[in-house]
Every structure is written in C-alpha cells, then in structure tokens.
C-alpha cells in the first residue's frame, strides 16, 4: 500500500490523471490524500470532485478555502466570479450530493503511524495536537448541522479572527480555526494572522511578518506537516519535515504528488490547451 499526497488540484483534472498514471495508482491498494482546494480556477472542477467521490475510502482530503467558497456559492451567499470557473459544477445535477460530500470532509487529517498531519494551509504554531484536533472537530461538527449555511458559512468571511484566543466562543472561535487552517501564510511577530502577503519569504518586504512554519511549534518538532495553499513557495521550505505541495498548476506551473513511503516527489507540468 502506498500513500500519495497531492497539492492543490483546483480543477486540473487532466494533470492529476497523468500524475496518477505515472505512479500506477490503484485505489484497491493505494490511498490518495489531497491538501484541499479540489476545485476553482482550473478547467475541470466537476470531474475532479466526481473522481474523488468515486474513490470512496481510498481518497482522503481536507477542506481548503476554495472548497468552502463553493459551499457559499451553492448556498447563494456569494456571487460567482468568472475567475472561480465554477459554473459547470454549480449547474451540475449532482451538485447537492457533491456539497454534502464536502461537508463530511475535515479541516485536518492524521496518519499516526507516520507521525503526519495534513491541513490545507498549515497549523498555528501555538497549537498542540490536542488543540488542533479539538478546534478542527468543532468546525466539522458545525458543517454537518442542517443550519450550516446560516450558522457557519454565511459568517466565516472575516479577517477579525486573526489572533488565537482560547477563551473565544461561538463563531469567533470557528472563524479563527478556518482562517488558520485554510488561509494562513504569514504571521506577525505577535502571532496575529496576516491575510495580505502571498509572496515567498525572500520577497516579503514587511519585517514584522514571518512564515507560520518559522515560528517555534511543538508539532513542527514531532510531526511531518503536509500542506498546500501557498503556491508562491513552489515547495521550497528548506525542511524535510515540511511538505509544501501547492506548486501552482492552475497558474501554469505544475502539479506535485508526494509518495510518502519513498519520500519522493513526482510532478506534472500544466498541460497546454488543445
């Protein structure tokens, strides 16, 4: 059995299929883990989502910011933009089933036998494994409720929840977890989340900002952390226990697959339009 981890697919279904063919992926024996953002921007979000649903227990994904955004669009809480490239999936006959499937997906996953954690954007440096589990579970619970659109999705868009406050309750607590696990790149030196800078560290001009993974963290010492979201890194983080897998396929770069057991990365360049 092999565990394959793939970066942000964002509708780049043809590239995903070529990657899986390169490693002879077989869902009857292997598992495909995705760092989230299965949809948006790329040409085949519908095919990507249907493929993951078809894999059953052989597919493990976490929610990314674009996956949550799809829920908001389906619930008529946001207006779709041409850059989302989500009209096909929103008009598909199985959109409700797709949304229900996404609602069952967590914000973090673990592979305990390999001391590995996967989330879309990373893990807040102050969080222990216990806190990470608890906070992610609160969001998952809210997503599974009948009133998830009104109680969570309609209120999740906020930059106000930028600082971890263990005494926070209700939507503010859920907002911070969503912001941290699906949107985080840089933190201020006081630990606040920054939502503006998307540049790689060498191009960041604000001396008050540091990448989240450069802060001291108990989980950074004990676990391999697999994440996506930050395409500008292009996988370059300088630490073998950090696996940054978003390599900008939807922006014209490439899609990256990491074979855990071999500690090997396989890439597929963005295909040219025919």
UniProtKB/Swiss-Prot annotation:
Its GO biological process annotations read: RNA decapping
Top EC class for this record: hydrolase
Q: Which cellular component terms (GO) are annotated to the entry?
A: cytoplasm
- Enzyme Commission number: 3.6.1.41
- InterPro entries listed in its UniProt record: Ap4A_hydrolase (IPR050126), ApaH (IPR004617), Calcineurin-like_PHP_ApaH (IPR004843), Metallo-depent_PP-like (IPR029052)
Keyword ATP-binding appears in the UniProt entry: no
Q: Which reaction does it catalyse?
A: P(1),P(4)-bis(5'-adenosyl) tetraphosphate + H2O = 2 ADP + 2 H(+)
Q: Which GO terms describe its molecular function?
A: bis(5'-nucleosyl)-tetraphosphatase (symmetrical) activity; phosphatase activity
The UniProt keywords, alphabetically, are: Hydrolase
Q: Which PANTHER family match?
A: BIS(5'-NUCLEOSYL)-TETRAPHOSPHATASE [SYMMETRICAL], METALLOPHOSPHOESTERASE
In the record, the note on similarity to other proteins reads: Belongs to the Ap4A hydrolase family.
Q: What does this protein do?
A: Hydrolyzes diadenosine 5',5'''-P1,P4-tetraphosphate to yield ADP.
Q: What name appears for this protein in its UniProt entry? A: Bis(5'-nucleosyl)-tetraphosphatase, symmetrical
Which organism does this sequence originate in? Shewanella baltica (strain OS223)
The root-end lineage is: Bacteria, Pseudomonadati, Pseudomonadota, Gammaproteobacteria, Alteromonadales
